[in-house]
């Protein structure tokens, strides 16, 4: 039989779709590079986590002895994984007529779908950060709000640099203020990295990014946080599986199925603050 449609005829196409999709998914995700990421399990079982508290250092007399202190974890929360997926349908006619274009379009479609899903889920967690809240619904964020949010987190003894991720219009209002705008710096290593397209500036240990996946409105919620404030638990990395549908379109089509399995949630809520303000 001539002109069979077999996997051998599409293997290169699928590989290219995967490469383009993975690149699009990676480049389109703003929040993920700044959160705690787990990748040590392929199980679909929930991950239960906790935190330790208590314990003090005290003087010990020369004739004294140390006393044991409680060392138990308090329940913190649960990360429950779920499968997320998207599909591109490539007919035989489309593949034969313009395979390079079909490859690119399918890859971008699947990658963008994955990136938007993950990023929207992570950005939606900003409203669950508990170190403090700055700004008001209907108001515009100010630099005083920014530094107050930083102070809220520092008060929790959270060390390291913080990421501040805002809706693009929230950032616009900050930088268009007529007074009180600090002299912002550029971190070259961030600007030239894969996340550089979303990077705006740095100041005082804070790196600023914009993310259009933050829900827009008069009370848009941005976040300032340390890495361990939010967790992303990947059980199955981004993958693509093709499936042949012989009856579709008369002479068949390839279903290019993309999927991931992951969990996400607030990990250390006190290690982040809410920045509320209009994005309209």
Say what each PLM segment does.
Residues 1-30, 201, 226-280:
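Protruding loop/beta-arch "assembly-hinge" segments enriched in small, turn-prone residues
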Residues 74-97:
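Short acidic, glycine/tyrosine-flanked loop/strand segments centered on an H-E-D-like triad
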């Amino acid at each position: 039989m001539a002109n069979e449609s077999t996997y051998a005829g599409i293997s290169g196409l699928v590989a290219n779709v995967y490469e383009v999709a993975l690149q699009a998914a990676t480049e389109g995700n703003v929040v993920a590079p700044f959160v705690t990421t787990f990748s040590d399990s392929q199980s679909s079982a929930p991950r239960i986590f906790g935190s330790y508290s208590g314990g003090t250092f005290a003087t010990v007399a020369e004739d004294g002895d140390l006393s044991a202190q409680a060392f138990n974890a308090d329940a913190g929360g649960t990360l429950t994984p779920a499968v997320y997926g998207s599909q591109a349908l490539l007919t035989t006619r489309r593949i034969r007529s313009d395979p390079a274009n079909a490859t690119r379009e399918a890859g971008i479609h699947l990658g963008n779908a994955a990136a938007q899903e993950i990023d929207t889920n992570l950005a939606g967690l900003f409203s669950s950060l508990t170190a403090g809240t700055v700004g008001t619904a209907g108001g515009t964020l100010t630099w005083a709000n920014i530094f107050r949010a930083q102070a809220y987190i520092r008060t929790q003894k959270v060390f390291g640099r913080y990421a501040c991720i805002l809706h693009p219009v929230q950032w616009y209002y900050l930088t268009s203020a007529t007074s009180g705008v600090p002299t912002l710096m550029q971190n070259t290593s961030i600007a030239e990295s894969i996340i550089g397209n979303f990077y705006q500036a740095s100041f005082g240990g804070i790196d600023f990014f914009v993310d259009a996946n933050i829900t827009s409105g008069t009370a848009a919620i941005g976040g300032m946080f340390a890495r361990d404030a939010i967790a992303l638990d990947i059980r199955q990395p981004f993958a693509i599986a093709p499936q042949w549908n012989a009856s579709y379109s008369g002479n068949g089509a390839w279903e290019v199925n993309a999927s991931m399995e992951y969990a996400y949630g607030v990990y250390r809520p006190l290690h982040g603050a809410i920045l509320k303000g209009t994005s309209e």
